[in-house]
Structures are given as structure tokens and as C-alpha cells.
Amino acid sequence: MLQIEGRSAGDCRVRFEGKRYTPFPASRGVWEIFLPLGIKTAGERELILERISSDGPAEEYSFYVEVAPREIRTIHLGKASQAMRSSQPSIPEQQKKVLKAIRNVEPKRYWTRPFSSPVQGEISTEFGLRRDLGTYSYYHWGVDFSAAEGTPVWTANSGKVILSESGFNVYGNLLIIDHGQGVVSCYFHLSKILKETGDMVDRNEVIGEVGNTGWSTGPHLHFAVYLQGRAVDPFWLVSFTSK
């Protein structure tokens, strides 16, 4: 989280990791934004603060932050997982809908309380795990909770449902909630969806039930959090907002 204070804070932009971000008003004279980190980002990184001026070039101020490396585990998926992906290939139009939703940036902030875990269940797969299928590999951009089918799933925080869809090949039945200011949460592989696109939801409101839909080999909830369109560890956000 980056906070900028001062009368001209609203005229500032931030450049970090090759992207430009616009902070949001938090209170009088205070602007802030969550800056996401890539999973492999480590070491000293430059952060550039731009102060936009109407009568001249922007002023730039450089800061450096030290990023601790993240340990990344790798698991090798078996033939069952490979066969499932072959029989249920990802569909471009479905993927585009999900990508558009997770990249949504709504200036309004919907939440005021800490984020929380969305289901009662054991963690079966952690964030950032590298999955190797032999011919290719990919990272697990969320946390999987193992739970019985039909277990209630609730919102991690208040927000607006921006995507409610069923029958997606990869994600199954899904809900995506916009919490405002670039914070988006995802709930995949549901058996039942209880909210529609456009619905406003409160923190800890039941929105669906755990299922086994899409690319899934057993009942579980895939819970993901995106900041400014980039996946981050959901438990980091839960911990940070609880301080």
C-alpha cells in the first residue's frame, strides 16, 4: 500500500514495475493505492512518483524499495489432470470475460472493514504454486480450499458483483466481485451461484456454494485476489487489512 499526503497529492501518478498507476482519494489530503508485485519480483526496485503540472513538465521523484524473494514450490500433475484439460479446453470468449473483470478498476471504494477468508475448509493448494504438466507449466494464482460440496461461500468483503457465470470450461460456475480501487476477488468452481451480475454484496454475505465444476478433480473453492489486474496472495490482503 502506497500513501501520498499533501495538498497536491491528487496530482500525482506512480510508475512501478513498468506500469503507471493513479492513486485514489482516501481522506482529506491523503491518496493511496495498492501496488501489486510480480511473483518473481525480488531485490531493489525503483518506484517513481510523478507530480503532474498544468503549466510545465511533470516533476519526478525516485524511491527504492527492497522486495524479499518468494519461495516457489513445483508439483507435477498426473495424467488425470492432463486428460481433463484436453477434454475441456479453455474457450477464448470465456477467458476474455474473466480477464476483463479482474482488470476492472472502479474509483469508488466499497469496503471499510478487513478482508476475510470466504469459506470454512482446509487449504489444499497455496498461492504461487508452480504446476508442471510436462509439456508446459503455469502458476496457481489463488488459494484452493478443500470443502464438501454445498459448503457455503461468502464474500471476502463488501463490493459489487461484476461477473456471474455458469458452465465455464476452466472456472466452472463463478463469481467475481469488485471491491473498488482496483481490488477484485474471484470465487471459482461453485456448485451453486446465489448472486447475479450487478448485485451489491456485504462482507461475509453468502454468495454461493462449494462445487466441483470446471477444471476440478474434487470439491473445492478457488479463491483469488487481484490488485490493479495482477494476482496477489489473498492471505496477504487479509493480514494487511486486519492490522
Predicted regions and their residues:
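Conserved, short, structured surface segments that act as functional micro-motifs
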Residues: 175-178, 183, 199-243
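Terminal peptide-recognition signature
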Residues: 18, 47, 123, 145, ...
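Envelope-exposed proteins and targeting segments
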Residues: 10, 43-45, 61, 119, ...
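Zn2+-dependent peptidoglycan hydrolase active-site motif and core
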Residues: 156-194, 219
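Small beta-strand-rich domains/subdomains or short beta-sheet motifs embedded
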Residues: 146, 152-156, 187-188, 198-201, ...
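Cationic-aromatic interfacial patches
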Residues: 1-70
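Short, well-structured beta-strand-loop connectors
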Residues: 152-163, 194-210
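Surface-exposed, glycine-biased beta-strand/turn segments
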Residues: 64-171
